Structures are given as C-alpha cells and as structure tokens.
C-alpha cells in the first residue's frame, strides 16, 4: 500500500529561502519566486505539530486549476517542475505537484473576502449589529442563509494571529479608492464564477479569501485561489439554513482541538492518526470533486 510522505519543513540546497508562512515556503529563483506548499496545517492560527498527507499537493494543484480556469491576470508561470530551472529540477522528487514558479509581486496589505452566505465571523457580526463589515443586511436572516447578493468584506493581513475585518472606507484609506474598487470588482467576479462552477459539481462556495498584488504595475491575482484553506465549500446535498453545514476543510481538526480544550496558543499538539486520515480524505475529496476526478499526477499532465 502506498504511503504518501508528509512534508512539514522545506529547505532546498542552492535556492535561497526568503520566507515562510503557515503553510508555504518561498525561495528565490532569479527574478522569480518558487512557492512550495507543505503539508503543514494551522487551526485557530496555530500550526499543528504534524502534517496532513496530500494536503500541500491538493492546495497547489487546485490553485493551478483555478488560475487557468479564471480569466484574470495572475502570477503563475508553471507548476511543472520539469519546466523549471535546473536548480529547482534538482529537487524534483520533493517538489513535484507541490511547487509553483511565479512572478514576484508587491502584495496589497489587505485580504479580499467575498461572502455569499452568512457564516463564520460574518454570522457573529450580523448577530451583534445586523450588518457584516458595515454592510447592512435584511433582518431575520438565519445562520448559513444565502445572502441576497454576494458582499465584499476586506480584512487586514496579519503576519501572525487573526486577520481583522475592516470596512470598505478603511480599505480605501490604505490602497486608494480606484484600487479598492478594482479589487472589490475582481473579488466578486472571481467568487461568482467560482460559485457557479462549484454548483455544477454539487458544491456550495460559501465564501472565499483572495490576495492581489502588483506585477509590473498591473493588479494581479496571487497566492492561492479557491482552495479548501482559503474558501468554505459545503456539499449542496447537506445544506440547511440554521446550522453550520459540514465543510471540505480542517473541521475534523477544529472539532478535535475543541474536544481537548486546546488553548489556541502555540505550540500546536500532535494530531491523532484518525483525525489526520479523515482530514486528508476531505482535502482529496474536494480535489476530486472540483477537478472531475483523477489523481494529482493526472491533473499535472
């Protein structure tokens, strides 16, 4: 039986390491950037001690799928390790299916969030104020209700800890009105297209978080796109208003951490094998459903 290796730390001889996020490690490749998606998993903004098999490959290949599906400028050059420079190809066994060569961008210091359903922090905000990020919504909506139309709710980009929701006017103060309006339009367009496609696969795209930056002065989609880490997907068959529907992400991990009364501060605990296995299967299921089946390597080709 094949056992998928788990990658939680990545350092590559001959490639300068630039930075690491909760999941991704970045390396310099000339003027470009190599983004390696590891199998690390964070919950409640804390990285767990062990990784999730297949997670990094699923996130990387799904982002590639969406970059190619969406008709918007993006930073992707290639996900095919065999097309990358020799310094990268030297690490092909580690990098295949989990590495992306991209153009360097100057990121905007905001997260661009689109919400089509009332869930998560949006639901909490609505219960207190009747609005989400300053956007007033109809009275009497229930948890997980579909919104009359998708809304744009930007957030600050936190290096550590939680992103914080901000109003559109606050975003304007950070990036300028013209840029803010363009980012809002792009975000809502991408969400609408992604949600329509997901619907054909029996999924509801409840919300998503996108990042943009400037490449040669042009607004460009960067980072990850419409993955289970950046988006909330629900099986349409299980959707009900008034409850939080099951999602294709790390819910098993969050439920486990709540059951052990995790303090939500580092270090993260070691996840038990059953939680790891069920979480891995959720990520792989999302990949199979969204891409029409097949294996990671089939999509790579």
Regions found by a protein language model. Name each.
Residues 2-155, 264-270, 274-301:
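Active-site loop/lid in soluble adenylation, ligation, and acyl-transfer enzymes
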Residues 38, 94-95, 193, 220-228:
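Catalytic cores of nucleic-acid ligases and guanylyltransferases
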Residues 175-206:
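A long amphipathic alpha-helix within ATP-dependent nucleotide-binding catalytic cores
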Residues 103-105, 200-208, 213-215, 280:
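Short, active-site-adjacent segments that bind or coordinate small-molecule cofactors and metal centers
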Residues 241, 245-273, 278:
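C-lobe/activation-segment region of protein kinase-like
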Residues 206, 210-251:
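Catalytic activation segment of kinase domains across protein kinase-like and atypical kinase folds
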Residues 145-177:
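A short mid-domain helix/strand-loop element embedded in enzyme catalytic domains
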Residues 1-2, 201:
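Hydrophobic, aromatic-enriched alpha-helical segments typical of multi-pass transmembrane helices
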